[in-house]
Amino acid sequence: MGSKSPEDHRQGPDGGSADTAIAIVNPPKSAAASGLLQGMLEGQDEDGDDDDDEKTGIDLKTNDGAKKKRKRNKKKSKKLSVVQQTSPPRVPLATLFDNQPYPEGQIVDYNVKDDNLQRTTAEELRHLAAVRDMDDDFLKDYRKAAEVHRQVRRYAQAIAKPGVSMTRLAEEIDDGVRALTGHEGLETGDALKAGLAFPTGLCLNHVGAHWTPNAGAKDVILKHDDVLKVDFGVHVNGRIVDSAFTVAANPVYDNLLAAVKAATNTGLEEAGIDARIDHISEAIQEVMESYEVELNGKTIPIKAVRNITGHNILRYRIHGDKQVPFVKTKTDQRMEEGDIFAIETFGSTGKAYLQDDVGVYGYGRNENMNPAVLHQSSAKSLLKTIDANFGTLVFARRQLERLPGVEKYHLGMRTLVNSGLVESYAPLVDIPGSYIAQFEHTVLLRPNCKEIISRGEDY
């Protein structure tokens, strides 16, 4: 989920067709190898041997005196059902993995650079706070969230074909995340245990970020010539995995997608403890803008979007206080041990500068505002519901509307937004007729290595 640049930044609360047949997805090989799929082969008994080879020692004499051996009846083998993910994915990961460890992300050793770097006292304190936050369940929670993301997006990629509606795609992603985390989010506080980290973003063509379907609006259908960016987040106990990809049915956009994917991978390669953010930004832009795309007979340079950035992630907060631009910048900021970053890039065939559009993508709580300013009872009640169910997580209208008892909330929400207690987020767009692509991964800067936690076989 992109973070807007400071000059325009309104930071969050810290913040085929529908009947396409999809093959059932098997669990990861690592899970099967670790004993996840436990079952006996047909025709084997409990000792693992084939009963056909077993004979009894009982001798029977025939009339001619010859001996023959009587076969013992075969034991009927017990078949244990193999746990597999369904399509669409709805089996909770806790059931699928059955206490087995969740898969690691991509582990990358650091490149040791002798910069003779010194951290200031403030940086040391910030680093210590980040390390303290990495408790015993840190990696378990992060790897679970990442595996949920991989399995849900695998299905999303399979159905994101021309003819699918954005509403269906968003609902499949939302429902998949809830099912696999095992938290439907209907009971008070359940969505804070695990689930969606922010509204599922489905942005077409010149819409760069922060668009999601809302109830009551005209549904949008994916077309052959569309460029679709799919950006969604999964959290487990506030550990947020933020990852995004782009799909395009028309191969004319292949170079656009390749440029952005290469730029994101460059950012991931450069990321690490003590890495200078200005160096990372410059490297990203150099790779991104080395590509061109031919559209309607014209060769168009691909530009790195200037006013949206990658960002660090805090617990229950999708946007922290560090940003990673995609263009050359001046900053003394460095990445630090314990940091978690969403390394993402956006490439555009337009002006590569995004502006607010009409509509609402989502809402987020502003913790810096005192709720004592509220006097309207409906607004107070709505704020209580938001705090209890979303906390500092950004949420969409459809997430709020599915909660029991939430009705006719629009006046209360308007009051909360006008008072500054809740911030609203608009879609971000480039010029009409342009096309934007996005790729994104979450990386953990662990003490001895970096782990690209959301990496999969797809991207």
Swiss-Prot record:
Binding residue positions for substrate: 210, 319
Record: residues binding a divalent metal cation 1: 231, 242, 440
Record function comment: Cotranslationally removes the N-terminal methionine from nascent proteins. The N-terminal methionine is often cleaved when the second residue in the primary sequence is small and uncharged (Met-Ala-, Cys, Gly, Pro, Ser, Thr, or Val).
Location relative to the cell: Cytoplasm
Comp. bias regions, Basic and acidic residues: 1-12, 55-66
Biased amino acid composition, Basic residues: 67-79
Protein name, per record: Methionine aminopeptidase 2-2
Region (Disordered), start-end ranges: 1-87
Residue numbers binding a divalent metal cation 2: 242, 311, 344, 440
The protein's required cofactors: Co(2+); Zn(2+); Mn(2+); Fe(2+)
Species name: Pyrenophora teres f. teres (strain 0-1) (Barley net blotch fungus)
